[in-house]
Amino acid sequence: MSDAKISRIAVLGLGNVGELAATLLQGSGFSVTGVDIAPPNHAVPFAVASASAASKKELTKVLKDQQAVLSCLPYHLNEAVARLACELDLHYFDLTEDVATKEVIIELARRSGKLMAPQCGLAPGFVGIVGAHLAEQFSTIRSIKLRVGALPQHPTGLLAYSFN
């Protein structure tokens, strides 16, 4: 794996989460290209490209000059994006919580010379960061349990809510 610092990153999917991620990355010194099939019609602080996540040809054109890709797309699109990132020798990050997709990406990581990091979203991603920060506040810790609320695909119970 190269020690070259990542400076160019594409953020796929410019919904609320993707646009925020792209804005924060740009503000942190990265050169960001936001990619969406329907780019925002308002000003954003990063370059924008139009491409369909379903089109390998369109994505390849946008990603070929990048060093990394952050997928903020629906989970069912991430496997194809991760495979393309591996082909193009790009670092890969996503926000998915889908176990099957994560397993495919872990297998791709074994062949890739780049970082392939699924599940960088709320849980386990952000929750792990919060847990580590909280742990630093104590001299010793026996255990940490963090719970994340989720909207299940098949809601049950009075609240139609679940804890992961």
Q: Where on the chain are the PLM-derived regions?
A:
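NAD(P)-binding Rossmann-fold cofactor-contacting core
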Residues: 29-44
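Glycine-rich Rossmann-fold phosphate-binding loop(s) that bind the pyrophosphate
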Residues: 14-15
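N-terminal Rossmann-fold NAD(P) dinucleotide-binding loop
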Residues: 18-19
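Conserved Rossmann-fold cofactor-binding substructure of NAD(P)-dependent oxidoreductases
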Residues: 53-65
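Rossmann-like dinucleotide-binding core of oxidoreductases
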Residues: 114-164
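Rossmann-fold NAD(P)-binding glycine/threonine-rich loop
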Residues: 95-118
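Beta-loop-alpha module in the N-terminal Rossmann-like domain of NAD(P)-dependent dehydrogenases
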Residues: 68-85, 98-100
